[in-house]
Amino acid sequence: MTLISRCSMTIEETLQIALDAHRGQKDLDGRPALLHPIAVGLMGSNDTEIMTGFLHDVVEDTALTLEDLRGKGVEEDVLAALQLLTHDDGQNYFEYVRGIAESGNITAIHVKTNDLRHNLERGLKTYARAEEQGDTAMMERLARINDKHRKALHLLSCRCGTQSV
């Protein structure tokens, strides 16, 4: 008889953690912050990438810690990727991205790539709305953010041999 091991946590359970953790948060464009991790999760190519995508902003943007997530039953491979994906404010952003690229953790690399692609897509749309409204301050802010995301995506793709946007 062959035993099939069941993951300790389902995609639905990780989505619920993200829903609860991001409740009430808004993004720069005024939309619910949760829409971004959902989009990043849906870009995943396997269950681990989907779960990591759903949770990728939880430690960075909410009160939950990696230990809290471990206590909720999040798998160790997801936690390892989340540790790499959590940016410490004291660390240079591009060093952080370089660390992900050089880690060899395929889940973290794929999720960060998906994160950057989605952030850039959102940023370009929000920039267009700001331009239509004549909001030059928002346009300048978004131009800097979009440029940072382009550079990070390029850095990640060059280090990992993936295709850039």
Regions found by a protein language model. Give the residues of each.
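Active-site helical microenvironments for divalent-metal-assisted chemistry
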Residues: 2-165
